Amino acid sequence: TAAPVVRADRHREDALNWSKRLAEMISSQGPFDAVFIGRTSGQYGVGAVAPNGDVLEGDAAAPAFESATREFVEQIKPATESVVFMRGTQWPYFNVTTCLAENNGAGAECTFPRTRADDALAAAEMRGAEEAYPGHVFQVDPAPIACPTGMPRCPTVAPDGTIIMRDGSHLTTTFA
């Protein structure tokens, strides 16, 4: 993100500097057919720093992420035909294999909520990107595959018995 990020009450100047260097690198090395931007659901238990220095947490950080993404995409759009956002899947926030082992492989005991911690921030980033580069911004969302729409909770074991998550945040190679 190009937003001034904070995590654990610590300003993340390193993330801001990395984002600036990345935009410069993309701009100088293009043209590209597409630039892919990944995000992870669990990463954004963070906030952003407002221009006045206040720390904005959770959904309150959405305007800062929207503005920062708009700025980032404005910088890179001359170097790419498209910008593709890769959404993260839901995170169980517990170790799935441990849960399955403790419950004799009973996946029903190890389900987790469908919600993603980053929904508001991801939507804000998409708005910012689309405002900067209308018609050239796309999103790939693997969540409906890992957590099918219509299910009240996300499974950890697929109907064919394949374990979906290998820990608290990663899909298994077999499932992926």
Placement of each model-derived feature along the sequence:
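Extracellular glycan-modifying ectodomains
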Residues: 1-176
